[in-house]
Amino acid sequence: MRKAYSVILLLAVVVTGCSQRGPEQSLFDQQMDCALALAQEYGPITEAIARQTAEEFDGVATEINYKSPESAERKCQTDSCMPFDLKDLARTTVVATWDSAAVGEVVEFLITITTEQELFGRYKHQTSDYGYWGDIVNLQFDSLMTEIQVKTYGMFYAADPEEMVRETIGDERYEYIYSVTGVEPGMAHVYYEIIRADTSSEATIAHYKQLSREYFRILQSIPKPDE
């Protein structure tokens, strides 16, 4: 029933556009408000599970992050979906392990405990032609999914700016990664923005994809520091 309702509203939004807010858009807004409210309700549970997982593997978990109404609406338009179809209105990241080969153990633990609590929704492994890879476990609540990403220390370092990396994993781990790899944090995002830019030529895209692959290769598996 909700699926049919969603399709009708989606067509209305796509056809009329955001500039013509009629009754259909008001219904879309109502669903958005409800989905965002549920994300706030389910967020603390999601964060607690992420922290439990992080503690099991001597890692850390980021504070729960909620999509803004504006960001959620843009994603609905980009993905041609409705608010309840979004799986990351509330999301957090578990940062654990130094070797990418060990991520599977973290994911398996996360799947096990969410299954025991009847909250497991789906597992997705992401890959790309520019070196990025990631693992996502979605929790399924009554009518909305939330998201827990799983990353190694190196992959987290690759994707986020220095301030956030230091705040999340601590200065000691940050300095260790930099001393071992010699690369700056957050460059994966810089390369990605250039790769996806409409103004980038094919040669530019190919060049930065190669830089990105090399960058991720360096950070994929880092020797565990001596305790």
Q: What are the language-model segments listed below?
A:
Residues 97-102:
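Helix N-cap motif at beta-to-alpha junctions
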Residues 2-9:
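Sec-dependent signal peptide recognition
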Residues 86-95:
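Amphipathic interfacial helices
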Residues 22-54, 61, 103-120, 130-227:
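An acidic, glycine-/histidine-flanked metal-binding catalytic module
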Residues 74-87:
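Short, flexible, solvent-exposed loop/turn segments with mixed acidic/basic and small polar residues
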Residues 61-77:
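Feature for intrinsically disordered/low-complexity regulatory segments and propeptides
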